[in-house]
């Protein structure tokens, strides 16, 4: 049980280098919505 607690405690340190990537992730769906508008503008909203 204590081993599991130690592993869980180490996880945030292990993922620390990825923090900047995680900060950007919520913005990705917005890019897809913008892409949809650009695509429709390119095909003249058929």
From Swiss-Prot:
A Gene Ontology biological process term: photosynthesis
Domain of life: Eukaryota
Maturation-removed propeptide residues: 1-9
Subcellular location: Plastid, Chloroplast thylakoid membrane
Membrane topology: Single-pass membrane protein
Any coiled-coil regions, as ranges: none
Keyword field contains Transmembrane helix: yes
Observed effect of gene inactivation: Not able to grow photoautotrophically, grows normally heterotrophically. Accumulates less than 10% PSII, although the subunits are synthesized normally.
Record's keyword terms, sorted: Chloroplast, Membrane, Photosynthesis, Photosystem II, Plastid, Reaction center, Thylakoid, Transmembrane, Transmembrane helix
GO cellular component: chloroplast thylakoid membrane; photosystem II reaction center
Regions crossing the membrane: 18-38
Known partners and oligomeric status: PSII is composed of 1 copy each of membrane proteins PsbA, PsbB, PsbC, PsbD, PsbE, PsbF, PsbH, PsbI, PsbJ, PsbK, PsbL, PsbM, PsbT, PsbX, PsbY, PsbZ, Psb30/Ycf12, at least 3 peripheral proteins of the oxygen-evolving complex and a large number of cofactors. It forms dimeric complexes. This protein is tightly associated with CP43 (psbC), one of the core proteins.
Task of the protein: One of the components of the core complex of photosystem II (PSII). PSII is a light-driven water:plastoquinone oxidoreductase that uses light energy to abstract electrons from H(2)O, generating O(2) and a proton gradient subsequently used for ATP formation. It consists of a core antenna complex that captures photons, and an electron transfer chain that converts photonic excitation into a charge separation. Required for assembly and/or stability of PSII.
UniProt similarity note: Belongs to the PsbK family.
Name assigned to this protein: Photosystem II reaction center protein K
